[in-house]
Amino acid sequence: KAYDDAMGVDVNWTNFSTGVQMTEAMLAGDIDIAYSQGLAPFITAVQEGAPLKMVSIAVVYEANDCFVSDSLGITSANASELEGKTVAVPLNTMADFSFRKQMAALDVDISTITIVDQAPADGAVSLADGSVAMACIFGGASAKAAGEVGKPIMSTQQKTDAGIGSFDVVSVTEKFATENPGLLRTFLQVTEEANMKWTASDAQIKKVAADAGMDVPTTKNQMSGFVFPSIADQKATYFGSDGIAVSAAESLGLVFKKPGAWNVDDK
């Protein structure tokens, strides 16, 4: 209702299970704005020529883990011992981005590492049978399997301190952004206001759980690490020269024209 009142139009919300579905809906002309689309599917779509633009960061959450085999005795303290070894990474995903950022933070030369492109489930198997020294994983089941034979090379706190995280974006069709910059700007402003009011209170968690069809404990646990960056923080940290959004996009195989992504304030 807040969006309807501020934008002066009826905003129709549609739920999608994946970022890929969001892309398909935008390309079909069914939706104009995708809120909380995964960065990886957005990048993949743009690489394939989809006329989409990233205009904001929806939510930031913990980066994917890279599990190193328990048999090797390698930790963040001696991570350089990974040099010369083989690592499983699902390329062109946020796990790939996390891998590269973690290795940089630990001063590991990835040019010396043999990287094999494996889906998380396959990477977990390779870690278990000793085919790889480390596997970078996403997905609960694969992470659980990898955790049975290995441990994350960096802890949650270490990743946070190093500024390594994953994030979803707000993306739009070029057509909508060009024809309706005012509506888009208002949408982002209303979103900012809602984010600033978020305190993860029991009432807020219950509402999200009800809307998402999830139970309260699961919702609370899943959202415990969520961060909703302010517009000011996004401009300073994500969309500035060499910002996180630019760095992430480059790591995923797409180089934005710096200083950053499309900016609604320039329209």
Task: Map each language-model feature to its residues.
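Residues that flank catalytic or metal-binding motifs in active/ligand-binding sites
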Residues: 62, 83, 166-168, 252
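Alpha-helix boundary recognition
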Residues: 27, 46-47, 80-83, 128, ...
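Stable alpha-helical elements in mature extracytoplasmic
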Residues: 18-22, 41, 78, 95-98, ...
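Pocket-lining segment of extracytoplasmic ligand-binding domains
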Residues: 122-211
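Secondary-structure end/capping motifs
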Residues: 178-259
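Short, solvent-exposed loop/beta-turn-alpha elements that line the ligand-binding surface or hinge
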Residues: 1-9, 158-163, 231-245
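Short, glycine-/small- and polar/acidic-enriched structural segments
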Residues: 1-109, 114-118, 126, 133-139, ...
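Long, low-complexity C-terminal extensions of enzymes
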Residues: 260-267
